[in-house]
């Protein structure tokens, strides 16, 4: 009887310790970029972790509420055609990242103003939650001054 109990306990322990598969970080970032370019604010916010961090220059936003309001909601309507060029990426069972360069069209605030183009470097880091969903945990953008689009 003791052997059967130990065998069952061992089986349950092994079943609960399944090894996680690495994320498809390209698919995660494409989902984020597609939602951003389609102005799907709620979808973008839904991809953020509760403890997400956003850094850009000397700006730092902490947590889903602040990042949602001060980065996503305040900038999503002023940008379009976000594109990335990945230079480095990596994944394991709980963390995935991509880093590289980006370009984005900057829409004018007034109709008579010219369109701009923004370029810079990015890092997006995703973490797997306890519910097995991947969420954007860290975003860092370092951009050059916006140039008039030719």
Segments predicted by a language model, with ranges:
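Hydrophobic/aromatic beta-strand elements that line small-molecule binding cavities or substrate pockets
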Residues: 32, 67-71, 84-89, 102-103, ...
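Surface-exposed, charged secondary-structure patches
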Residues: 72-113
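A short gly/proline-enriched turn/hairpin at secondary-structure junctions
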Residues: 47, 51-62, 74-77
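Short, low-complexity N-terminal intrinsically disordered segments enriched in polar/charged residues
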Residues: 4, 16-50, 148-150
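Short beta-strand edge/turn micro-motifs at domain boundaries
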Residues: 119-147
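Hydrophobic h-region of N-terminal signal peptides that target proteins for export
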Residues: 9-16
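Sec-dependent signal peptide recognition
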Residues: 1-7
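Hydrophobic pocket/interface hotspot
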Residues: 32, 44, 52, 63, ...
């Amino acid at each position: 009887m003791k052997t059967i109990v130990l065998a069952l306990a061992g089986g349950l322990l092994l079943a609960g310790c399944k090894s996680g598969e690495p994320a498809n970080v390209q698919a995660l970032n494409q989902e984020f970029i597609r939602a951003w370019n389609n102005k799907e604010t709620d979808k973008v916010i839904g991809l953020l972790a509760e403890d997400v961090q956003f850094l850009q220059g000397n700006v730092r936003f902490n947590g889903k509420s602040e990042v949602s309001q001060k980065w996503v909601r305040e900038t999503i309507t002023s940008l379009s055609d976000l594109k990335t060029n990945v230079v480095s990426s990596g994944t394991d069972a709980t963390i995935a990242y991509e880093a590289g360069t980006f370009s984005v069209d900057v829409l004018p605030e007034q109709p008579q103003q010219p369109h701009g183009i923004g370029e810079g470097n990015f890092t997006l880091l995703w973490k797997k939650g306890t519910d097995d969903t991947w969420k954007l945990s860290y975003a860092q953008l370092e951009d050059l001054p916006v140039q008039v689009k030719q």
